[in-house]
From Swiss-Prot:
This is Large ribosomal subunit protein bL12. Pfam families: Ribosomal_L12 (PF00542), Ribosomal_L12_N (PF16320). GO terms for molecular function: mRNA binding; structural constituent of ribosome. GO terms for cellular component: cytosolic large ribosomal subunit. The gene is rplL.
Amino acid sequence: MANQEQIIEAIKEMSVLELNDLVKAIEEEFGVTAAAPVAAAGAAGGGDAAAEKTEFDVELTSAGSSKIKVVKAVKEATGLGLKDAKELVDNAPKVIKEGVAKEEAEKLKEQLEEVGATVELK
């Protein structure tokens, strides 16, 4: 049986298509999913109703006139592939990131607005 280092070296040598097939095979074999878990906002027991919101959804409402720059910015911010980022921008309004901290949400909003996008924090 291969040790951990040998497995990692084998993975490093794989193409993106081979890695995609590997992930699918692992999902089927072990009955798991490779999707990242989405952090759900926990209910605060007896929390103050006026408490400041700590998690935000960043929604792209419009790509504006610089769609190519917006697609690149969305791709960089989300880690999506070029095709998926373009599809997300083409289908605006869409949520780009969910449940992010206020600072990160504001930073992402600023980055997207710099390239001409219209963004809302919800």
